[in-house]
Amino acid sequence: MRISLPTVASTVREIAIDASVYDNKPSVTIVEIMGRHAGWLTAASVLARKFEGDNPVLIYLPEVAFSPDAFIEKVKEKLTKTSNLVVCISEGINDGNGTFVCELASDVGTDTFGHKMLTGSGKYLENLVKEKLGIKVRSVELNVCQRCSSSCLSATDLDEAAASGRFAVSAALDGETGKMINFIRKSDDPYILEFGTADVNEICNKEKAVPEEWITKDGSDIGDEFIAYARPLIQGSVEVPMKDGLPYFAFRK
């Protein structure tokens, strides 16, 4: 998840800049971001804001119930303050009773783990805005790019990934087995992190949700607590190796 935070924030900032060219008439851009039950990546879009009131103006996570009617009213309200509105949503936004928004529009398949394959929440809301408000609207899926792009790597993330690997080797040499490395945040400011081990059975196939107190009461935005948590993770730039004008990756033949 962590490697994707700067990618999501950077991409959403670029989308917001593109949306700003439509100042002459109201427009809505809906960005669908990965996250079935946990909205960490979608929450990262708040880092794209350059100032208070900047896009993305609305952010919706799956941790709180989503109401299409309330969404439309909120869009109408925000369009009175900005003519180009960017909205970020998690693919797993739901009504709080187990029904995903994307299920309101189409049949949904399952993956090899039996989890519902969620696609179409953004498209559903695009059509809803078009139907209810009759304005220019488009939806964008970040899709696999949000987890595989290396264009916005964080030095902090790479350093901690390497350090956790060294910690894991040391733990294995000490005889620990059936464990995963966990990251223990000791402080946000100054940023202090420690490593530990945890039983793999306590972690596999489980999810850590964004704390509800980090989400605004109406469920349409992210609070400062998340920003304090996430901002340290995207610090430091990394020079990506290039060849012939493109990123150059190690690969197996």
Language-model features: locations:
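C-terminal non-catalytic interaction/assembly regions of soluble proteins
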Residues: E103-K253
